[in-house]
A protein has these predicted regions:
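Conserved pre-catalytic core of RNA-dependent polymerases
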Residues: 359-595, 599, 897, 934-954, ...
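Short, conserved micro-motifs composed of acidic
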Residues: 550, 561, 655-691
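Surface polyanion/phosphate-binding segment centered on an Asp-His-Pro turn
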Residues: 101-239, 246-247, 687, 702, ...
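Eukaryotic helical DNA- and histone-tail-recognition domains of regulatory proteins
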Residues: 1-36, 62
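Active-site metal-binding core of divalent-cation-utilizing nuclease and nuclease-like domains
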Residues: 920, 976-1019
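Surface-exposed loop/turn segments and immediately adjacent short secondary-structure elements
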Residues: 108-125, 129-136, 228, 235-443, ...
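Extended C-terminal regions of large enzymes
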Residues: 271, 278, 282, 739, ...
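Basic, alpha-helical interaction scaffolds
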Residues: 681-757, 775, 810-823
Length: 1019
């Protein structure tokens, strides 16, 4: 059963009445039990022990908030002071009915100000407890604060603490360490007042193998027992007659006869049939219970952590037991990589050249962090992204606005005095994500580091300052798109690359390319080079000093969770490389590789993108972070570019991943094989005709293989849709999961891969087929509704065709806007003569319809349908509230199968006689009259509201349910009842009264009932 809040309030309040506010607990359990079953007679089967246990659970697990508990205490205290008859009599063991009724009708009657004061009191109490509990504790050892549902209550609690409590603890003399401590205690106080549990023991959160619940163990044990008994009887019937088996079979038959209320079995075949039926019952029950548990687990996980839910889908699809590396090998490999303080070559000639070249740059002034900087940075942070080792989420810094000005002040002081940086500031937790199925190799992991949120806020402010300096002085080259704001990233590079490859292929021009892959690029760049880069590009002195200091303090702990194994290493000092997971890291890393772009561009040895003699551009390379592709018109020139890249990489101590480096040589449309030998003797092999290279996510050779890539993407998309439909998500969550997990597989290819309308229509058709296969979409329901928003009566599935058209249009506009400032983009725009799906050379292409136009057109088309259009026509009438009509689609969490069935009813595609005869043209149906009343045609409208045979049964039951809802709402509003129960379980009492209100229940005909309901609603 489910304990409602009203029940919990009654138990807690009655307990206080009986014990006189816990001053006399003598024999209270029997009195509490009697009072409870008197108030809730339908729960008379609950034992005295169970009621006493529930009282303890209410207090221990805070089933009633602290505010509610204090409120009930005040009410009981006032009641005891004003009415002595509430005292428990000495010669009786139970409360009398008047006392029970007095408390049962006692409801909260505090005003808004009193409620606010109680909230503030509770917050202050929890805040003081947190200050006492966590004072003088290591910030890295404090317990984790769980994520909270973003509710009005949470915002109210946060605002109250921010306005009334924090100002008493934060002032101009507060240090950064103290500020961090106060924010943590504030987060703990708000979380606890919001009902969250904060475990003191951090070991409690280690990954444990999920054991089956008790009900599952009981059912499995019972099924195993039945199968064992069934097997023994089967063997006995087949002729096995050992003495042991005979005794066992006799015991089984005796047990079956003793536990039956029906006619006893007379032979062994009947006993076997009985066991077979029991086995079927229990196995089906186990299946149902597991589905229910999966449904609850899937939807809860989807609500709180979509990313983790999608990751579990990927893990479940592989069904492969992955073996992690040993803790020693994991620690050893990454320690060897990070703890070696390797220096770059400061005497390299190109460093002198780069230093001389950048003399034109205006030096960056010393930076001060302002409150505006803090607000702008924090507003762009995700509320509940994984926190660092200090366990404070972004939400608390965002909503504790009183701290922003003091945070800016402390950050400015920190930039000017880096030695004041707290020790925990630079400690990270690095989560190791496997790159492939070779999980035993510690090098096959991608390290993602979670740093303290307060550190990331500071580095985000610094990043904005540095990026503005780079923009003002035009420092970053346009060939690098890894950290460029407002760029299109990988897709922009792929479009430029596609134009180059297709122009070369169609015109049979010479093109020589090389793919360069760095081995552990982020993890191997020397700190000495990162420091010198800041000096070369004239970053402000205080930022440079601060970054130099914190680099010397970087350390992290590796965490690897695989299957049921969790590995945690000792802290590792970071003396080489840069964190992956910090907003400053991409920009800093791109600055470290920026001189290479200058060295390559000054050679003028690239490939010439031509439109005509006036519009052309020589391109030598494209960069996306550390993914480098070189272009040249001859093999000799390409070798020169490779030599420059090799020299630069060697000087900054970054190594090539030789296995992933390739060259390709096309002369007059024909392939040639020329390997490139590095100075160390290693070879970069040339690609042969059948070999492809995965560049930024797409396999390519002389060009992108559109057909094979499309087939791969379609297969992956449909596989993700299938994996989603196999889960137990609710209808709304199922559609959202398809839009956010499956559709992006295709979205990334829009603008790069040639998709025709036929391709996209077939994908949508396959999607609808899968929905139909899983009973989520009726095969004859309106397909238009699938792609309409839920607020308009649809289901919210993304229309892939419109999404494709919109992305193509947006990319075209982006390139056209860049032509004024970029010669590269201007040349690519003129050169793209249907080489890519954008067809940038053709400017007279109509844009797709806007979102509003698309919705309006679809609704009009839906209305014009002769059968499907009846429902929207009814909803569009003035007497119908269309918003309320469609609310259930947006707010109710119902099964996707139920949702699809309800929409099929609205679309009137249920197999009624009228539908079979007039829509299906079924010649076997000669009479379409109702099979119950035989008075008129059997349509959906007739079945749900006009059949005389259903009037006194189904219709009356439906109207009674409506009356129950109204009855309960009125009773709750006027404090006649305290417990809200589901309407289908609610049984109205004949008469309920208080001192000022009463409500009665009677049985009337349908017409009179409707009149009474109208009168109640009018009042």
């Amino acid at each position: 059963m489910k304990w409602g809040e009203g029940m919990n309030r009654f138990i807690f309040g009655t307990y206080l009445v009986i014990t006189k506010l816990e001053t006399d607990r003598t024999a209270y359990r029997g009195k509490l039990h009697h009072a409870f079953i008197t108030q809730y007679p339908h729960l008379a089967h609950l034992t005295e022990q169970r009621i006493a246990d529930q009282r303890r659970v209410i207090i221990k697990n805070t089933l009633l908030t602290l505010d509610t508990q204090e409120q009930i205490r005040h009410e009981i205290e006032a009641l005891l002071n004003t009415n002595n008859t509430l005292a428990v009599q000495d010669n009786t063991s139970v409360l009398n009915n008047s006392e029970i009724q007095t408390f049962a009708t006692l409801q909260p009657s505090i005003d808004t100000n009193n409620h606010t004061n109680q909230t503030l009191t509770s917050l202050q109490k929890e805040f003081d407890n947190a200050l006492l509990e966590f004072s003088n504790t290591d910030p890295t050892q404090r317990p984790r604060i769980p994520k909270q549902s973003h509710t009005t209550k949470l915002r109210t609690l946060s605002q109250t603490l921010n306005d009334h409590i924090l100002p008493n603890y934060i002032n101009d003399n507060t240090s950064l360490h103290q500020l961090h401590f106060v924010v943590y205690c504030g987060a703990v106080a708000v979380s606890r007042c919001n009902g969250a549990r904060i475990a003191i023991n951090k070991q409690q959160h280690t990954t444990k193998k999920r054991s089956p619940p008790a009900w599952e163990k009981r059912l499995i044990t019972r099924i195993d027992d039945i199968r064992r008994d069934l097997g023994r009887i089967t063997q006995y019937i087949q002729g096995t007659r050992s003495s042991k088996l005979t005794r066992q079979v006799q015991h089984i038959t005796t047990k079956l006869n003793n536990h039956t209320t029906r006619e006893q079995n007379t032979n062994y075949n009947e006993h076997r049939d009985t066991l077979t039926q029991k086995l079927s019952i229990y196995t089906n029950r186990l299946k149902r219970y597991r589905e229910t548990a999966d449904r609850k687990r899937h939807n809860t996980q989807f609500k709180h952590n979509e990313k983790l839910f999608y990751r579990s889908l990927t893990q479940n699809s592989t069904n492969e037991k992955l073996i992690p590396p040993s803790l020693h090998s994991l620690q050893q490999f990454w320690s060897d990589l990070w703890t070696k303080d390797i220096k770059h070559n400061p005497q390299a000639p190109w460093i002198t050249t780069e230093t001389t070249r950048t003399e034109y740059i205006t030096p960056m002034n010393n930076t001060n962090i302002t409150t505006t900087d803090i607000i702008q940075t924090i507003n762009h942070l995700h509320n509940w992204k994984s926190p660092g080792i200090d366990n404070i989420h972004n939400f608390w810094w965002k909503y504790f606005t009183y701290t922003h000005s003091y945070l800016a002040q402390q950050f400015t002081e920190l930039l000017n005095s880096p030695d004041r940086t707290p020790a925990f500031f630079t400690q990270g937790i690095t989560y190791m994500l496997p790159k492939d199925n070779n999980t035993q190799d510690p090098s096959k992991y991608r390290p993602i580091t979670c740093l303290p949120t307060i550190y990331k806020i500071l580095t985000s402010c610094i990043t904005n300052k540095i990026y503005q300096h780079c923009t003002d002085n035009n420092i970053l080259y346009e060939e690098q798109k890894g950290c460029t704001k407002y760029s299109r990233g990988c897709k922009e590079q792929l479009i430029i690359d596609s134009v180059i490859l297709e122009q070369s292929r169609h015109n049979k021009r010479n093109i020589h390319t090389a793919y360069i892959d760095y081995k552990k690029a982020f993890d191997s760049v020397p700190h000495s080079w990162l420091q010198q880069v800041l000096s070369i590009y004239k970053i402000s002195n205080n930022i440079t000093q601060f970054l130099n200091y914190i680099m010397s303090c970087w350390n992290t702990t590796l965490t690897l969770t695989l299957n049921d194994t969790k590995l945690i290493t000792d802290p590792i000092q970071i003396k080489r490389g840069i964190f992956q997971g910090d907003s400053l890291s991409p920009l800093w890393f791109c600055l470290a590789l920026n001189p290479l772009s200058y060295l390559l561009n000054t050679t003028n040895f690239g490939y010439n993108i031509k439109h005509n003699h006036e519009i052309h551009h020589n391109i030598t390379h494209l960069f996306y972070m550390d993914d480098l592709k070189l272009y040249s018109s001859t093999c000799i020139k390409l070798n020169h570019l490779l030599h420059i890249t090799e020299t630069f990489s060697r000087d900054i101590q970054m190594d090539f991943g030789i296995d992933k480096c390739k060259t390709q040589h096309i002369t007059a449309g024909k392939r040639q094989l020329f390997d490139y030998e590095l100075e160390q003797g290693n070879l970069i092999n040339s690609m042969d005709e059948n070999e492809t290279y995965k560049y930024l996510g797409f396999q390519q050779n002389t060009h992108i293989k559109h057909t094979s890539i499309k087939q791969t993407l379609i297969t992956q998309y449909l596989q993700r849709v299938r994996s989603i439909l196999k889960t137990k998500l609710h209808g709304r969550n199922t559609i959202k999961a398809i839009n956010t997990y499956a559709t992006p597989v295709l979205t990334y290819s829009f603008g790069i891969i040639r998709w025709t309308n036929t391709d996209l229509e077939q994908i949508q058709r396959n999607t609808r087929t899968l929905l139909t296969k899983h009973h989520i979409h009726h095969p004859h329901s309106s397909t238009i509704r699938l792609y309409l928003p839920r607020s308009e009566g649809g289901r919210g599935l993304t229309d892939i065709k419109i999404l494709h058209q919109t992305q193509i249009h947006n990319f075209r506009q982006y390139f056209y806007n860049k032509t004024d400032t970029s010669v590269l983009h201007k040349t690519v725009t003129y050169a793209d003569k249907s080489y890519t799906p954008l067809n940038l050379h053709e400017t007279n292409i109509l844009p797709p319809p806007s979102k509003l136009t698309y919705i309006t057109n679809n609704i009009q088309t839906w209305n014009q349908k002769p059968l499907h259009g009846r429902f929207p026509q009814e909803v569009s009438q003035d007497c119908v509230d269309s918003i309320a009509t469609h609310t259930w689609l947006s707010e109710c969490d119902i099964f996707p199968e139920t949702e699809g069935f309800m929409l099929a009813i609205q679309d009137q595609v249920i197999n009624t006689r009228n539908y079979k005869k007039h829509i299906h043209k079924d010649k076997t149906v000669t009479n379409d009259s109702c099979r119950l009343c035989s008075q008129t045609s059997e349509t959906i409208q007739h079945i749900i509201s006009a059949c005389t045979r259903l009037a006194q049964t189904e219709y009356k039951h439906r109207h009674d349910q409506v009356a129950k809802i109204i009855h309960q709402k009125l009773a709750l509003k006027h404090n006649l009842i305290t417990d809200k129960t589901p309407y289908y379980k609610y049984t109205p009492s004949y008469l309920k009264t208080t001192h000022t209100n009463y409500i009665g229940t009677g049985h009337y005909s349908q017409t009179k009932l409707s009149t009474i309901i109208d009168q109640i609603l009018h009042l």
